[in-house]
């Protein structure tokens, strides 16, 4: 080991990188690839055009050694915290964690003059707003100010045979005729019409009803009335029929309307198709659709990064179960289009669920009933693990673990109105040394939860220590026979194998999928994949294609795709290629030092600077618009 350290020092491995072969908390990269911060950025800047600015972004001091050791020493005492506090008094505090006050540029900001949708839809009727329309109606003026196309091929036109964005598409040259008409490939359109499409969209009529509060939640009100009358009995196969009061019984109302002699003389009610009693008799637990996913690979519901294009990437690499991003029940009940977009399901997602966040039984139960009759999912998950203050201070997320009475009402209420299994994702607890999961798991089993996913960290802990898999093993025994999935620190097939030995029913992959979405392939094939930089770029290119299909190919769609690509790159840059490591596998808590890859693209992908992520996005989506600003959500580094 001493010889390796000497070689590293001679090859420039010392200096700012400060990486030794055995340094704890740092990824063990081979000596011939390690370098310093200055040489790393000089190498990247050398490829830029002559005359470009070669400033090295300023960066705060490196993390103290004591703080890096805390990643592995879960039982560290409070001395390291005192050392860190004293260190921060001497030097300016470096921004870290979430960037809560980051500048947020909406994609519409980059499209100042937008064409009226009536012109895009090629409708025969004129614009309903007339002169009061705030959009542009002069096509010639729009084309004069429109930026140049980003490429010669339109993903939507090639995939679906028609681009609905017409002349506003940033690749419009691929499908505009000589007179500016939008071309259509009839054969491709006919073929795509027979294929399944993306589901779980929000209907405009339903959106208006939600905004005007005209939606009836009869089943939810019945369930809530049962909850207020007292504790409900434990759900068991013997409980068959939900009790209905006469005023809520549809059969009773019908008999009152046609009762007496007039009922015998009147004509029979015409029927069409089979008559069911789903509105009167709810499904028994044994009649509900079962969620049998034991042993399958579960992609975690990842806020911001777990969007539909990213889930398609993970499905292609072997993910079995997917779940939408966390959706707030109050926003869904208000008909917010952006929140309903989180529920969309691609046809490739064969086992798919949605995750709800809420703090009160009434809103959660009503939202569950709404989703039960409007969208197509295989399960509904309750978020009891969100640690952010915005959710926690309102009583949702992790706070539900300390509000067992409300938690019980939420679970029982939702379970009564849902026809699909109900699952829960939770943490070990709120405080770092006070675990609560082992106490709640038997209760959740009695309340009717079909499956629980346990993240082996508390709210206060966040990612400052390794996940507590021994505690997850203990909870798996307590939860039996209810299946329990484990989550935390899985970045290789060895990590997955060790996790399965704890007795869990399966594993959930979260950050590991962000760092390397091909992790699912590695787990299933039990091998390390030394993926090349060109293959990784192809994955990013596929993501941009999926993003343009999902968010659109106009300026707003392109910039929204770019934004989510950059957020993903803030995680992808932490991956260290297999061929560069001295020891396999890479640990998720090991910080990658400065290193030079086997080619320029591999080095560029290892950069932790947002300016370099922008360069990668420009390879795939063209140049950024003027005034572009990006500050990653989970990284203390900005590009302006």
Swiss-Prot record:
Amino acid composition bias (Basic residues), ranges on this chain: 92-106
Recorded coiled-coil stretches: none
Chain positions found as N-acetylalanine: 2
Catalytic activity line of the entry: 5,6-dihydrouridine(47) in tRNA + NAD(+) = uridine(47) in tRNA + NADH + H(+); 5,6-dihydrouridine(47) in tRNA + NADP(+) = uridine(47) in tRNA + NADPH + H(+); a 5,6-dihydrouridine in mRNA + NAD(+) = a uridine in mRNA + NADH + H(+); a 5,6-dihydrouridine in mRNA + NADP(+) = a uridine in mRNA + NADPH + H(+)
Annotated positions of the Phosphoserine modification: 267
An annotated Gene Ontology molecular function: tRNA-dihydrouridine47 synthase activity
Task: Name the UniProt key words of this record, in alphabetical order.
Answer: Acetylation, Flavoprotein, FMN, Isopeptide bond, Metal-binding, mRNA processing, NAD, NADP, Oxidoreductase, Phosphoprotein, Repeat, tRNA processing, Ubl conjugation, Zinc, Zinc-finger
What EC number(s) does its UniProt record assign? 1.3.1.89, 1.3.1.-
- What InterPro entries does this protein map onto? Aldolase_TIM (IPR013785), DUS-like_FMN-bd (IPR035587), tRNA_hU_synthase_CS (IPR018517), Znf_CCCH (IPR000571)
Q: Which PROSITE patterns match?
A: UPF0034, ZF_C3H1
User: Which residue ranges have biased composition labelled Basic and acidic residues?
Assistant: 64-91
Q: Enumerate the residues binding FMN.
A: 301-303, 355, 425, 455, 487-489, 510-511
- State if NAD is listed as a keyword: yes
Question: Any signal peptide, and if so, which residues?
Answer: none
Give, as one word, the top-level EC class.
Answer: oxidoreductase
Which residue stretches belong to region Disordered?
1-22, 47-106
**Cross-linked residues, Glycyl lysine isopeptide (Lys-Gly) (interchain with G-Cter in SUMO2):** 406
**UniProt record similarity statement:** Belongs to the Dus family. Dus3 subfamily.
Q: What does this protein do?
A: Catalyzes the synthesis of dihydrouridine, a modified base, in various RNAs, such as tRNAs, mRNAs and some long non-coding RNAs (lncRNAs). Mainly modifies the uridine in position 47 (U47) in the D-loop of most cytoplasmic tRNAs. Also able to mediate the formation of dihydrouridine in some mRNAs, thereby regulating their translation.
This protein is called tRNA-dihydrouridine(47) synthase [NAD(P)(+)]-like
Species name for this entry?
Rattus norvegicus (Rat)
